[in-house]
Curated annotation (Swiss-Prot):
Compartments reported by the entry: Cytoplasm
Family listed: Belongs to the RNA 3'-terminal cyclase family. Type 1 subfamily.
EC number: 6.5.1.4
Name this polypeptide is given: RNA 3'-terminal phosphate cyclase
Gene symbol of the encoding locus: rtcA
Record-level Gene Ontology MF annotations: ATP binding; RNA-3'-phosphate cyclase activity
CC terms in the record's Gene Ontology section: cytoplasm
UniProt-annotated binding residues for ATP: Q101, H283, M284, S285, D286
């Protein structure tokens, strides 16, 4: 059984999520201890338990220690199920995108439909529009096509969001994202839920003005206004579309934060990614690591975070893969077959 120190490195929920995904794919059981030991609320929280429950159901796993506050978990998976219709509720505003990240590799070419309820646009996790604009676009580049439907948005603290994954198809193989090609345009989505539409418009205007002051390319930002949602909130996500890759950013509104600041934050963030010469943005360089390790890929990430470093160490525990990381800002990630 693979033993994992949950307080190692960055020491957050990502260690558990990566372990769950790879345990399911390799059918290797693991024990994780000292879960989130250095965090203000140590142990498993509702968010993490939903990830455990999701992979447990998708693999008929035997699990010990799956309760709130638990600092140790034993996970023994069986084969991934071939078909089914599943629903997972993260509760209030727990992130649906972190659950999606955990289970997505398990769904490839299986007749499985999944509904995830919770927060779609919440702090400390990728927004649903970042996922749709950047993450899924990059997955398509490496041969994985995901059909994702956003049914309702959910913001912190009320949540109430819902997404559906109806199909994940693909034939992923080794990939190289070492060149960007020309920057073609920037696309985005600026949204509000149960708030005046001018907030979304101001976010978009501010982002567009900042970007056009820096680069002369087309900027198209769609306005998404949703009324009568359970939660109130706003946000914006942007993606820079290159000939060979996508770079993304996002920013969320909050009480007392002007819409113009929200828009400018996302614009500044994507501009920094554009001038970094990376082929994959800061968030994506962490998220893509798993896929690069499974299918032998290489890319240039804009910044090597402690999150990403920790992730690479967990991957090595499950996969017999030769991982090479060089540089920091930007950094090159390469995964090759272990000879």
């Amino acid at each position: 059984m693979i033993e994992i120190d949950g307080s190692f490195g960055e020491g957050g929920g990502q260690i558990l999520r990566t372990s769950l995904t790879l345990s399911a794919l390799t059918k290797k059981p693991f024990r994780i201890y000292k879960i989130r030991a250095n965090r203000p609320k140590p142990g498993l929280q509702r968010q993490h338990l939903t990830a455990v429950e999701a992979v447990k159901k998708l693999t008929n796993a035997k699990v010990k220690g799956d309760f709130v506050g638990s600092t140790e978990l034993v996970f023994e998976p069986e084969d991934i199920v071939e078909k089914g219709d599943f629903e997972f509720d993260v509760g209030t505003a727990g992130s649906v995108t972190l659950i999606l990240q955990t289970i997505l590799p398990l769904l490839i070419n299986r007749n499985i439909k999944v509904t995830i309820k919770g927060g779609t646009d919440v702090p400390k996790s990728p927004s649903i529009d970042y996922i749709r604009l950047t993450f899924l676009s990059l997955l398509e580049k490496i041969g994985i096509r995901v059909n994702l439907i956003l049914i309702r948005r959910g913001h912190y603290p009320e949540g109430g969001g819902e997404i559906k994954i109806t199909e994940v198809k693909g034939n992923p193989s080794s990939f190289s994202l070492m060149e960007r090609g020309e920057l073609l345009m920037i696309k985005g989505i600026s949204h509000v839920s149960s708030l005046p539409s001018h907030i979304a418009e101001r976010q978009a205007k501010s982002a567009k003005e900042f970007l056009l002051s820096k680069i002369k390319i087309p900027v198209e930002i769609e306005i998404d206004v949703r009324e009568n949602e359970r939660s109130k909130g706003s946000g914006i996500a942007l993606t820079a579309i290159f000939e060979k890759t996508f770079l993304g950013s996002d920013s969320l509104g909050e009480k007392g934060k002007r819409a113009e600041i929200v828009g400018e934050e996302a614009a500044k963030s994507i501009y920094e990614e554009i001038i970094s010469n990376a082929t994959v943005d800061r968030h994506m360089s962490d998220m893509l690591m798993l896929y690069a390790s499974l299918y032998y890929g290489e890319y240039i990430g804009s910044e090597l975070t402690s999150h990403a470093r920790t992730n690479s160490e967990i991957i090595k525990k499950f996969l017999n893969v030769n991982i090479q990381i060089s540089g920091e800002k930007p950094f090159i990630f390469r995964a090759k077959k272990e000879l």
